[in-house]
Amino acid sequence: MQAITPEAFRTIAKDASARWDAAFNAKQPDQVAAFYDASATLLPAGSAAVTGLAAIERFWQDLFAQGVVDHRIDMDEVTIDAGLAVQRGKWSAAAHDAAGTRQAFGGNLLLVYRRQADGGWKILNHIWNL
C-alpha cells in the first residue's frame, strides 16, 4: 500500500469529520457506525467502553433519542505512522432541556484511525471528554 503524508491524511480526516457530522446530525446511527473499524471502541466521557459495530450503532441510536443535535468536529492536529493515524481536536453539540432551552456542550476529542485493506481509513478508537 502506498504511504500517505500527514497533509494528505489531514484532507481525508477533514472530509471524514464533515461526513460523520452530517450522518450524526441526520440521526442516522447506521451511517455513523459505518465510519468505524469492525473492532472499533468508543470511550465516552464518564461511561463504559463500547466495542463492536452493533454496539456502536446502538450507542449512537440511544444518544439521538436523548435529543443531542448540531454535532461538530473541529480538527486541531493529525499525525500518521504506517497504518495508524491520529486526529486530535474539539467537538461540540447541543440538546434542549425539559423547558426547551438549548444547552450547548463540548470537549476534547481523539480519533485513532486504522488503514483498511482497500486503502481507506476507519475509526479504531474514539474518545472524548466534556
Feature map (PLM): residue ranges:
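Surface-exposed, charged secondary-structure patches
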Residues: 41, 55-99
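Short, solvent-exposed loop/turn segments at secondary-structure boundaries
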Residues: 45-47, 98-102
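Short beta-strand segments enriched in hydrophobic/aromatic residues
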Residues: 36-37, 91-93, 127-128
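Short beta-strand edge/turn micro-motifs at domain boundaries
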Residues: 106-130
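Short, low-complexity N-terminal intrinsically disordered segments enriched in polar/charged residues
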Residues: 1-39
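A short gly/proline-enriched turn/hairpin at secondary-structure junctions
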Residues: 21, 35, 40-51, 61-68
